[in-house]
UniProtKB/Swiss-Prot annotation:
Residue ranges crossing the lipid bilayer per the database entry: 72-92
Extracellular domain ranges by topology: 25-71
Family statement: Belongs to the ITPRIP family.
Coiled coil regions, renumbered to chain: 32-68
Main subcellular localisation: membrane
Gene: itprip
Gene3D superfamilies named among the record's database cross-references: 1.10.1410.40
Species classification: Eukaryota, Metazoa, Chordata, Craniata, Vertebrata
Protein name as it appears in the record: Inositol 1,4,5-trisphosphate receptor-interacting protein
Organism listed in the record: Danio rerio (Zebrafish)
Length: 539
């Protein structure tokens, strides 16, 4: 018995020691071995395994014949010991192989990323950053307030004129606008000033809108349209629960006690659905709405243009609310009016498009905008931050770098909304004390690193959708708060060349960060900082 056990141990040890990967030659990997040598080694290993199997069968037969013998206990001991030795050597061999044989994928990544710059290692001087912020962004503080006041007054006047030219009986009703974006969140970084306004509209009574969001289990919205929804124009009685006057003909001698005659005429008129909805459907068409909005804005401006001494022009005919105001002095203000539908008496809106996004080509899928909640979240979080916290400066610096990099290498899918989303995630995850003004350089690296990592992982989740960290005071609708998180990069990842361009853009921006900050920081002269902005250039 002991002789058989010894023979088994010798076979096991021989198989391990003769394994070609246990003691590889220095600087030699398996793919580099001669094929014939590998074939012979494999044949030798198969012979050893066959011999081992034969011996095991022999031992098994011997064990059966002497099962009553006390020496059988010794077999179990030696068998367990051999198993432990074999397992230990095998584990050590795997560690040795992992250390000796380089990963081809890692080599490939290393070769491709020879110019890779980690955002965590960017050289940033705290004093230079402070001077940069004081001279680049501080001049906009007071001026932005005046621009907002002017834009709000002008928008009120323009929308009031728009309402006056609309048919109250058979046309969309325009509601009060909501200001969003950098101008209304106090992080403007460049000129000319850009003001973004959401302009909600609603159908005439008794028509109403019904929503089908992507996160509703009863809807069938494609995965590449996450964050979108459809808007259905509903007549009373159209879903079997409302008044039937919208679905049957009452005749001339009958009246509906719930709706007056004008409302009934609206229900009988099929012109409005044809004007607003996609062909052969009851779903709102973005193209139809944008066409209606452009015509209405043009008529409204024609009605009030005599009151103003500036020019108003459409910057982009594809986006009807993309306006440009030009004063006689040459100063300009960019104004984006975006038609939208308010979602069930909340501050969430379904909008026709984002100014920086053209990826959604579906005519009936409207994009969800939570910009009002994001603005409120920034204000809410700022209350718990230290005085003169550095979070806004971090956002401004990265947005400034992005704008300058766009000037150098052209446009990409990367946008300021990605930057703001990353900042909101950091504000929700870091302690308020970490945003002290003296921590500007560290938090700036954190923001750049967060964006860099998100691009590498191809994941940047929406800051509000499905995020349990959002304070309850923000009052995000439950259906959105409990939905699955949305990856903002997903539509871009599906377009490889677009995503590759975005990654290249950001890597160049990280590489140029220190140089751009130094270049656009005014020099000191006689102990004072030289301001490069004149009052005429600030707008």
């Amino acid at each position: 018995m002991q002789g058989a056990i010894a023979r088994v141990c010798m076979v096991v040890v021989a198989a391990i020691l003769n394994h070609p990967l246990l003691f590889p030659n220095e600087n030699t990997t398996v793919p580099e071995q001669d094929e014939d040598l590998l074939a012979r080694m494999k044949e030798h290993q198969e012979k050893l395994e066959a011999e081992q199997k034969r011996l095991e069968q022999e031992i098994s037969q011997n064990e059966t014949s002497v099962i009553g013998d006390q020496d059988g206990y010794g077999w179990y001991f030696w068998s367990a010991l051999c198993l432990v030795i074999f397992f230990t050597i095998e584990v050590c061999r795997q560690d040795l192989i992992s250390a000796e044989i380089p990963d081809p994928a890692e080599d490939e990544d290393g070769d491709c990323s020879t110019g890779y710059h980690s955002a965590k290692s960017i050289a940033l001087d705290r004093g230079t950053l402070n001077n940069f912020c004081k001279t680049r962004f501080f001049p906009y503080t007071n001026e932005s307030g005046r621009v907002r006041e002017f834009i709000e007054g002008f928008a009120d006047d323009l929308l009031e004129a728009l309402r006056s030219i609309c048919d109250l009986k058979a046309d969309l009703e325009v509601e009060d606008f909501a200001g969003i974006g950098s101008m209304f969140e106090s992080w403007r970084v460049s000129k000319p000033p850009t003001c973004d306004l959401i302009v909600p509209f609603s159908p005439p009574q008794p028509l109403r809108f019904q929503f089908e969001l992507w996160c509703d289990p009863s809807t069938e919205i494609p995965l590449d349209l996450q964050g979108c929804g459809r808007i259905q124009l509903i007549k009373p009685g159209g879903n079997g629960t409302d008044c039937l006057c919208g679905s049957i003909d009452l005749g001339d001698d009958m009246l509906c006690l719930l709706h007056n005659r004008n409302e009934c005429e609206v229900l009988e008129d099929d012109a409005l659905p044809e004007l607003l909805c996609a062909r052969d459907t009851t779903y709102l068409s973005k193209g139809q709405i944008m066409r209606w909005f452009q015509i209405s804005v043009s008529k409204a401006w024609g009605k009030i243009s005599h009151k103003y001494d500036f020019e108003l022009a459409f910057r982009n005919l594809d986006f009807p609310g993309a306006l440009k105001i030009k004063f006689p002095s040459g100063k300009t203000v960019v104004l984006n009016l975006t038609p939208a539908v308010q979602f069930e008496n909340t501050d969430a809106y379904l909008i026709s498009h984002f100014p920086s996004d053209t990826s959604n080509s579906s005519d009936t899928h409207w994009q969800l905008s939570l910009s009002v909640y994001e603005k409120n979240l920034l204000k809410h979080l700022a209350k718990s931050l230290p005085t003169n916290s550095c979070h806004i400066h971090c956002l401004q610096i990265v947005a400034f770098l992005h704008k300058k990099q766009t000037t150098l290498t052209g446009r990409s899918a990367f946008c300021n909304y990605h930057i703001k989303t990353a900042l909101l995630h950091l504000l929700l995850s870091k302690r308020p004390a970490m945003w002290q003004p003296q921590n500007l350089d560290s938090r700036l690296r954190d923001l750049l690193s967060f964006l860099q990592q998100s691009l590498e992982e191809k994941k940047l989740y929406h800051a509000l959708v499905g995020n349990p960290r959002i304070p309850v005071e923000i009052l995000v609708p439950k259906i959105i708060r409990t939905a699955e998180p949305i990856n903002l990069y997903r539509p871009l990842v599906l377009q490889r060349h677009v995503y590759a361009k975005m990654e290249e853009h950001f890597e160049e921006m990280v590489r140029n960060t220190s140089v751009l900050v130094q270049e656009y920081t005014p020099h000191f002269s006689n102990g004072h900082v030289r301001h490069e902005f004149s009052s005429a250039e600030q707008i």
